A protein has these predicted regions:
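Short, basic/aromatic-rich helical patch in the C-terminal catalytic core of site-specific tyrosine
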Residues: 57, 78, 82, 155
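C-terminal flanking helix
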Residues: 37, 79-86
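Short, conserved phosphate-binding/catalytic loop or strand-edge motifs used
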Residues: 47-62, 97-102
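C-terminal catalytic core of Y-nucleophile DNA break-rejoin enzymes
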Residues: 114, 174-194
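Short, intrinsically disordered, charge-balanced linker/junction segments flanking boundaries
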Residues: 1-4, 192-197
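Basic, Lys/Arg- and aromatic-enriched nucleic-acid-binding interface segment
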Residues: 68-77, 87-152, 156, 166, ...
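N-terminal DNA-binding module of tyrosine recombinases/phage integrases
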Residues: 1-55
Length: 197
């Protein structure tokens, strides 16, 4: 009987403790918790886990249609949480209320700096470096972002042990998509060689 009385808010606590906290990388965990706190729990937190319907989840998704990226991320969190609810015996198998709900199309989120913007940024970094108004590590980090195409977190957590000057690459052991090698061109190698160790 207890399992039928469990609310989505209570399920979310277990989901956090047994999945988010132990299986997700910190950035993803933070995003899952934010989605739960801001969108999912206010919408369906008081409902009984066993009673949540496809219509409830569709309503949550539809209310965020003006921000498709956010709506779709919430759908992913709900889907994972209810998959685990099935695994934990809180719902019958194959009853995930997210099933068959289609995601909204998303606009590509990539934006590249124009040649003029890149030139202006380069000049600003050079000025900041010459005038010593900015931390040299911050300037180097921005340059590495530009020259490598790495994610911000990959550069911010970069260690010297990941840098292979001989092979001209970064060997990143734990990125968002797993281990990967980033090949370094001359500008990136120059930036790295000028950083104090």
């Amino acid at each position: 009987e207890r399992r039928h009385a469990l609310t989505v808010a209570e399920l979310a606590q277990r989901f956090d403790k047994e999945h988010i906290a132990v299986r997700l990388k910190p950035g993803t965990a933070q995003e899952y918790r934010r989605n739960l706190r801001r969108f999912i729990l206010p919408a369906i937190g008081r409902l009984k886990v066993a009673d949540v319907s496809k219509a409830d989840v569709a309503r949550l998704h539809h209310e965020l249609r003006h921000i498709p990226y956010q709506a779709n991320r919430n759908l992913e969190v709900v889907s994972k949480m209810f998959n685990l609810a099935e695994l934990w015996g809180l719902r019958s198998d194959g009853s995930n209320p997210r099933r068959h709900l289609r995601k909204y199309p998303e606009e590509k989120r990539e934006r590249y700096l124009s040649p003029a913007e890149l030139a202006a940024l380069g000049e600003a970094l050079s000025r900041a470096e010459q005038e010593r108004v900015e931390d040299p590590y911050a300037i180097a980090a921005i340059r590495l972002l530009i020259f490598t195409g790495c994610r911000l977190n990959e550069i911010m957590t970069l260690k010297w042990s990941y840098v292979d000057f001989e092979a001209r690459c970064l060997r990143l052991p734990d990125t968002k998509t797993g281990a990967r090698i980033v090949h370094l061109g001359a500008p990136a190698l120059d930036v790295l060689s000028r950083i104090e160790r």
